[in-house]
Amino acid sequence: MAQTTKHIVVLPGDHVGQEITEEAIKVLNAISSVRPNVNFDFQHHLIGGAAIDATGVPLPDEALEASKKADAVLLGAVGGPKWGTGSVRPEQGLLKIRKELQLYANLRPCNFASDSLLDLSPLKPEIVKGTDICIVRELVGGIYFGERKEDEGDGVAWDSEKYSVSEVQRITRMAGFLALQHNPPLPVWSLDKANVLASSRLWRKTVEETIKNEFPTLTVQHQLIDSAAMILVKNPTHLNGVVIANNMFGDIISDEASVIPGSLGLLPSASLASLPDTNTAFGLYEPCHGSAPDLPKGKVNPVATILSVAMMLKLSLNMTEEGIAVEKAVKQVLDSGVRTADLRGSNSTSEVGDAIAKAVKEILA
């Protein structure tokens, strides 16, 4: 069988970013050890605070150019109090790479990697059992990229929210595609604030028309964002399916959802530049948690980053079997009790990574 090389740019970022990306690479190397026809080529570059310290900018040109040429990008975490809220901030590197690479769709699953984790949720197990939501957030438009005015001494500041029909159609098509990958198709929920905001009224109208005209077998239900935030806590399974939201609403609701499984260290994410209809969409993959500057070395949970690699394998690298194997390995390891402290365990970051890598080899052997 012909040798295939997958080119992956690794952006460890700040604080725990280095540790978690090392464990993710460990799992990918475990795959190549039992799939000799596949080789992973890793290129490491700076982003965030580490890049500011070394180069003065949060996203060096060489990191961006390398990312553009890669099959996928693996990101650790960026930010920390060291860099404050000055004019040059680590988070600017994230916003820039999303915009430059046109990573318009952020996918954040909210589910339980194993039912053995149900007791860790801040909600009652009987309420959260069966939660299976994929939040699809529009990532390169809206208020985060709109015109703005800072307070220049006059005591006035403002931000603007703007969406076009084409932007809303594009993210709706992503949600529709993902819903159709299941049999029966998943329901689609669209979150907005159409009772107040003009941009939300355009959003709702465009989502409705796009689903009706292009995905006639799907159902779409519209929910006001504040109501959805309450439902997510009271009865999260009610929102099971694909949830679509604009940039700011998606940012907030996905962070709320991330608390349901009991630890931010469990949840992966993917940011895609196109539909994964051939399993080769270009994407950036990262855990949902931050850089955890106060966490001692060896304590961070690598599961979210490793599950992000599972998404990468399935959506960008056309290695669905291997991606599923990683998910199975994570479940096996968690069920065996090998866990970091955030999951009431006593294992180190590298011990969890070692156990998952070993399980992946056994599953694929």
Curated annotation (Swiss-Prot):
The record, for SMART domains, names: Iso_dh
Q: Does the keyword Transcription regulation apply?
A: no
Which keywords does this chain's UniProt record carry? Answer: Amino-acid biosynthesis, Branched-chain amino acid biosynthesis, Cytoplasm, Leucine biosynthesis, Magnesium, Manganese, Metal-binding, NAD, Oxidoreductase
Positions bound to NAD(+): 80-91, 290-301
Q: Where in the cell is it found?
A: Cytoplasm
Output the Gene3D superfamilies linked to this UniProt entry.
Answer: Isopropylmalate Dehydrogenase
List the SUPFAM superfamilies hit by this protein, alphabetically. Answer: Isocitrate/Isopropylmalate dehydrogenase-like (SSF53659)
Could you tell me what the cofactor note in this record states?
Answer: Binds 1 Mg(2+) or Mn(2+) ion per subunit.
* Residues at the site labelled Important for catalysis: Y144, K193
**What is one process in the GO biological process aspect for this record?**
L-leucine biosynthetic process
User: Can the keyword Metal-binding be found in this entry's annotation?
Assistant: yes
Q: Where does Mg(2+) bind?
A: D226, D251, D255
Q: Which InterPro entries match?
A: IsoCit/isopropylmalate_DH_CS, IsoPropMal-DH-like_dom, Isopropylmalate_DH
The residues that hold substrate are: R98, R108, R137, D226
Q: Which residues cross the membrane?
A: none
EC number(s) given by UniProt: 1.1.1.85
Describe the reaction catalysed, as an equation. Answer: (2R,3S)-3-isopropylmalate + NAD(+) = 4-methyl-2-oxopentanoate + CO2 + NADH
Q: Which pathway features in its UniProt record?
A: Amino-acid biosynthesis; L-leucine biosynthesis; L-leucine from 3-methyl-2-oxobutanoate: step 3/4
Molecular function per GO: 3-isopropylmalate dehydrogenase activity; magnesium ion binding; NAD binding
The family annotation for this protein states: Belongs to the isocitrate and isopropylmalate dehydrogenases family.
Give the multimer and partner information: Homodimer.
NCBIfam families annotated for this entry? leuB (TIGR00169)
Q: Tell me the function of this protein.
A: Catalyzes the oxidation of 3-carboxy-2-hydroxy-4-methylpentanoate (3-isopropylmalate) to 3-carboxy-4-methyl-2-oxopentanoate. The product decarboxylates to 4-methyl-2 oxopentanoate.
Q: What is this protein called?
A: 3-isopropylmalate dehydrogenase
